[in-house]
């Protein structure tokens, strides 16, 4: 299904289903004996969504012989990629709060449970922004399993295509205080101009000393749509409404590091391949890797 400017979704369809897939990957990485990450809430959230494919994937019960383009090696590569991504952003928040930041904004938060699982310092406020149905589902599900936030959690039930800066301000956000922003797994679902607008808005709300973390996929400019469709086809054969080729926005866009530097941030990046090496994880072979190619994880600090 082609994206539209006002399309909506739940956690079992479209962009929302990718959040559930990512959470399933975190649940599997949490069970990995290498212990790179610990997300105890990913599994109950995925089970509550109720998509059989992701539940079986999480439990290791998929019949991979019956799924086109699925092999144990490819599944493990996905889990490893999710592990290093999650670890990078977890460490980012620890570093930001160690530096004294006590305001956090998670954009398009999906099934992110960091407000519940990270050791936030006293006085930390975590703002989560996402579509109303997504926010409500996660809040209710985590309440049902007895989870309690480890920081003050404030939810902003609004799509990022709306006036989220105004909604954030209405929830008590203070732009005069340094903020740690996160835009994880988001940019590929934004048109190029919306990506720029997102960073413009963040910059307008960020005091010096604020930080931001995100990832950039250079291959989004000319990604292999046919390979992506082939991989998505295996999902659809098993009742999962994900067609990645139609969900992402391809084409030329500004490189995030260059764009942030131009806005007064000091940005730097590390490739996913480097993160695999850093954590002693085997780098996936090209045929088992993300069809969008290399991923650059970026962190930046507002300097002016």
Swiss-Prot record:
Keywords: Methyltransferase, S-adenosyl-L-methionine, Transferase. It comes from Mycolicibacterium paratuberculosis (strain ATCC BAA-968 / K-10). GO terms for biological process: methylation. This is Putative S-adenosyl-L-methionine-dependent methyltransferase MAP_4189c. It is an enzyme of class 2 (transferase). The keyword S-adenosyl-L-methionine applies. It comes from the Bacteria. Its EC number is 2.1.1.-. PANTHER family: S-ADENOSYL-L-METHIONINE-DEPENDENT METHYLTRANSFERASE YKTD-RELATED (PTHR43619), S-ADENOSYL-L-METHIONINE-DEPENDENT METHYLTRANSFERASES SUPERFAMILY PROTEIN (PTHR43619:SF2). One of its GO terms (molecular function) is methyltransferase activity. The lineage of its organism: Bacteria, Bacillati, Actinomycetota, Actinomycetes, Mycobacteriales. Pfam families: LCM. S-adenosyl-L-methionine binds at residues 130, 159-160. InterPro entries: Ppm1/Ppm2/Tcmp (IPR007213), SAM-dependent_MTases_sf (IPR029063), SAM_mthyl_Trfase_ML2640-like (IPR011610). Belongs to the UPF0677 family.
């Amino acid at each position: 299904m082609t994206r539209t400017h006002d399309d909506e979704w739940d956690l079992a369809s479209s962009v929302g289903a990718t959040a559930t897939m990512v959470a399933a990957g975190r649940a599997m990485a949490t069970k990995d004996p290498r212990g790179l990450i610990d997300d105890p809430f990913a599994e109950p959230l995925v089970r509550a969504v109720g998509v059989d494919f992701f539940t079986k994937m999480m439990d290791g019960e998929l019949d991979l012989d019956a799924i086109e383009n699925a092999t144990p090696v490819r599944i493990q590569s996905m889990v490893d990629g999710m592990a290093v991504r999650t670890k990078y952003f977890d460490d980012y928040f620890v570093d930001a709060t160690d530096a004294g930041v006590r305001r956090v904004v998670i954009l398009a938060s999906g099934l992110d449970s960091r407000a519940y699982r990270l050791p936030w310092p006293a006085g930390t406020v975590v703002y989560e922004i996402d579509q109303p149905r997504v926010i409500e589902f996660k809040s209710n599900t985590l309440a049902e399993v007895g989870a309690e936030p480890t920081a003050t959690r404030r939810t902003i039930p609004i799509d990022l295509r709306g006036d989220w800066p105004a909604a954030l301000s209405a929830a008590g956000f203070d732009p005069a205080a340094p903020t740690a922003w996160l835009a994880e797994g988001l940019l590929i679902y934004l048109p190029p101009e919306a990506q720029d607008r997102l960073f413009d808005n963040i910059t307008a709300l960020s005091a010096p000393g604020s930080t931001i973390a995100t990832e950039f996929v250079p291959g989004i400019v000319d990604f292999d749509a046919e390979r992506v469709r082939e991989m998505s086809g295996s999902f659809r054969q098993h009742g999962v409404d994900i067609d990645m080729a139609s969900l992402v926005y391809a084409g030329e866009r500004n490189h995030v590091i260059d764009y942030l530097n131009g806005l007064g941030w000091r940005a730097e990046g590390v490739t996913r391949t480097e993160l695999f090496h850093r954590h002693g994880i085997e780098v996936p072979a090209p045929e088992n890797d993300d069809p969008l190619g290399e991923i650059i994880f970026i962190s930046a600090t507002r300097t002016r």
